[in-house]
Amino acid sequence: MSVDSMLCDRIDIAKQLIKRSEALSRSRVGGVEGGAKLCSKLKAELKFLQKVEAGKVAIKESHLRSTNLTHLQAVIESAESLEEVVSVLHVFSYNDQFGEKQSLVVDVVANGGHTWVKAIGRKAEALHNIWLGRGQYGDKSVIEQAEDYLLASSQQLVQYSSPHIIFAFYNSVSKPMAEKLKEIGISVRGDIVAVNTSQENLPEENYLSGSESDCDGDDTAVLHVSKVDTENIVASIAFPTEIKVEACKRVNLDITTLITYVSALSHGGCHWLFKEKVLTEQAAQERQEKVLPLLKSFMEAKELFACESAIKDFQSILETLGGPAEKERAALLVKSITVVPDQPSERASKLACSSKINSRSISIFGTGETLKAITMTANSGFVRAAANQGVKFSVFIHQPRALTESKESSATPLPNNYASSNLL
C-alpha cells in the first residue's frame, strides 16, 4: 500500500471512529465518562492526518503506521463488546509497592465498574520481544503493566471486590505471554499465536566465558532464539458474553430508604395533588416509575442491616409524620432487619462535615462500609460530597419518597382523566 492510499485509509478510519465514539457516549443514560476525551483524541488524530494530506506536515510511512489510531480503535472495539460501560480512558490513583502515589489509565471500565479492560493494538512480535528484554530502553512489558493493573485494582474495590481485569489483544499475543497473564490472574481476549524456538550457533567468545559455558571444549555456544509465528493461531478468545460477578449479599439501609419503603406514595397513594410541592413532585415521579419494585428486587435474598442511629431517627420521624398504615409497614420492615451498633469505618470517620455531610450520615454510611454491605439510599448529595473528599461508598441510589399518609386529608385527589402533561 502506498503512503497516499494508507493516508486516505487512516483518515477514513479516524472519521468512522469519531462517529462510533459519539455513539458510545450516547449509549448510557448520562453518558459514558471519558467519552468526550476519547472523541477529542480521535479528532486530534484526524486533524494531524489532514495536515499531512494537505502537505503541511512531512511524515514517514513507519510513523503513519504507528499513529494512536490503532490503540484508540482497540479501545472503542473493547467498549462496544462489553455491557454496562461506565467510563473510558479513566485515570485511577494507587500506591505502588514503595508507597509512592501512581496513576493508571484504564482503557475501558465496564460491567458497572466490575471489569477493567486494557486494549492493546501493538503486534504480538513487538510485545513478545519487549517481554524478553529486546525492546527499547524504558519499554514496559505487558506483564509488568498487568502487575500494575492488579495492584491498582486491589485498591479500587467495587462492592468490596477487586475489578476483574481483561487484556484485549487486537494484533495477537504470544502463547507464553498469554499463559503468564492467566497465571497471575489476568483474563486474555484475542488471538493467541505460537512461538517457534530455533537454535543458533555463536562463537563462544560472543556468548559465554569458558568458565560459564556448559559446552565442554566446544568452540561454539548454542543460543535458543524464540520467534513469534503470527500465522499459527493456537486459540482465539472472544470477550465473555456474560461476566459473572460475585454479588454482595449484605445491604445497609439508610433512613431515606426506610422511609421510601413504607411511604404511602410507594403503596399506591400517589394519585394526589398535595399542598407541598415536593410531595406532588414525588407523587408524579411515582406514577411514572414505581420505586418499591426496584427496592424489593435489590433487597431480595440479601441480609438486611441498619445501624442504631438510622433506626432511632427513622422511628422518631415516623412517630411525628407517619400515618397508621405507614407505621404498620415500618414495624414489619424493622423485624426483618438486623440492627447493629454504629460502627463507622476509619475513612468515613475522617470525612469533614459540610452542608451535605453530617455526623448521622457518616455513622450510617460508615457502618455499611464496616459491615462490607451496600448502602441503599436516596441521599445522593452525601454520596457525591463524600466522593469529592476521596471517599467512594458502595451504594444503591434510588428516588426518594416522603411519608404522606397523614397529608392525604388536606390533599386533592387526582381526577381520573388527569393528563400526564399536568402532573405538577
Swiss-Prot record:
Organism encoding this protein: Xenopus laevis
Pfam families: DUF1308, DUF5614
Full protein name: UPF0415 protein C7orf25 homolog
InterPro entries: DUF1308 (IPR010733), DUF5614 (IPR041076)
PANTHER family attached to this UniProt entry: UNCHARACTERIZED DUF1308, UPF0415 PROTEIN C7ORF25
Record family assignment: Belongs to the UPF0415 family.
